[in-house]
Amino acid sequence: MPLDRSGYWQLIGKSIQGVQELYLKCEKDLSLELASSGIKLRVFTDPPDINLICFIVNKDGNSSLSRMNELNKAICDELKFDPAEITKRPEFMISITEFTYDQYGLEGFDGKNSMDEHLQVLGISSREFGSVGRVSVLRCTIINPWCALSRGGKPDYVEVFATTLKATIERVVSNLSL
């Protein structure tokens, strides 16, 4: 790969390709697998246009945004890097952010805000967003431009990440009483 502008764009392109493949795996396969266990996975941005995927997890039947936020924080706690626990190094890492009502709750011309559709799919009302004031959103970044090239290989990082994420989500959901 050239060490000039053309090489830089190849790195960016491969990173975005990797995140789009991860998006498809999560949106098409993982969300269906989790649904059979009564777990909802909502992936944002169809398809991703940068090297970032944001997603939210909820348990079927849970209509409390506060409880859903707790669930997503617990999932992040399992897959985050903690420098205080140097011996606990997750194979993959995710992070968490908050979408606040002040930023994402403003109504558009159609009377809806940018989170309405996502929350509806997850079983959470828009009123909950207004009263709680924030939604905890999980995210992961593909920083390896060769992730897409590992597809079908050993290891296939997209498959391994999806398997790790699924096991973590199922374990956390089973340990929390929602």
Task: Cite the ranges covered by each PLM segment.
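Conserved C-terminal alpha-helix-loop-beta "cap" of PLP-dependent enzymes
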Residues: 1-177
